[in-house]
UniProtKB/Swiss-Prot annotation:
Part of the 30S ribosomal subunit. This is Small ribosomal subunit protein uS17. One of its GO terms (biological process) is translation. The lineage of its organism: Bacteria, Pseudomonadati, Pseudomonadota, Gammaproteobacteria, Vibrionales. It comes from Photobacterium profundum (strain SS9). Belongs to the universal ribosomal protein uS17 family.
Amino acid sequence: MSEQTRIQLGRVISSKMDKSIVVAIERMVKHPMYGKYIKRTTKLHAHDENNECNLGDTVEVRECRPLSKTKSWTLVRIVEKARV
């Protein structure tokens, strides 16, 4: 069997920690009763080895082994830099 690693695309909402970032993943979920689509956000803590991400960057992260209590994702690449 091939090993599947999860890859997510999200926006950096915090980069104040050393070698760590917080990435917000937004998704649309259909309300079970009313059928309206609602925006839901998941926050992931990811490892940024070179401290290259800034606030607002669009990044790609992938799942890895647990690196700390809350951090089990690592930065793959920066898709788009934030406009300043």
